[in-house]
């Protein structure tokens, strides 16, 4: 989507809760790269989760 979100904390399950469009969303990585704190691009929306593409 070209938009980005900030990951502050990653849970033990590898997921994060991020703010997007004024609401909390569960986010997960698109590939094998684990989520780490920082800014990530949004690759797509998958149901109620954001799939994050790359970190920058």
Locate predicted features.
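Terminal membrane-proximal soluble interaction domains of membrane-associated proteins
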Residues: 2-56
